[in-house]
């Protein structure tokens, strides 16, 4: 019997390195599909449409929202982001594990609709480290940097509401922690109820 895949939520403040950690996870954990989010923000250097994001106009985004295409959607820093249902549930039914790299508010929206989601929060080692990473991007004004840091503090305070917290002190070690969480969840009773029910002929 083919088991359903997991829905995995990966969150963390901007600059925590969650994207880098996720890329490292995908190098060794092959049963993982990354849900490509829809956004109205402009592409950053090196980003490719339909690979990093589905880039849409505000009008296109609102049309998708009106059609009920999103599992969740949020406005962050003046830009809209959304997770397409089609990017998630078709793959889960095929046995693939799907990861959503989304912010805290979006994560709680998904958990409210899909309580079995595995939620993982990526933390920096310190606020000083986080500030250094953000400043190192060279793309933030001093005012924008302070806004990001205040937002990050608020997000980190929500980390205790997640199922798991990992600290990104070393990318490889942090990725290994994420993989260990996924593997443990794959063996959990909540994921294997259908399998046990089939094995026993529906006697439970």
Report each predicted region and the residues it spans.
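Post-Walker A helix-loop "phosphate-sensing" segment adjacent to the P-loop in P-loop NTPases
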Residues: 26-35
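Post-Walker A alpha-helix
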Residues: 21-22
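Conserved phosphate-donor/acceptor-positioning beta-strand/loop module used by diverse small-molecule
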Residues: 98-103, 112-136, 168-170
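ATP-dependent small-molecule kinase phosphotransfer cores
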Residues: 37-98, 105-108
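Conserved lysine of the Walker
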Residues: 18
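P-loop (Walker A) phosphate-binding loop of NTP-binding proteins
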Residues: 11-13
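NTP-dependent small-molecule kinase module
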Residues: 139-140, 154-204
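Short hydrophobic/aromatic beta-strand immediately N-terminal to the Walker A/P-loop
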Residues: 7-9
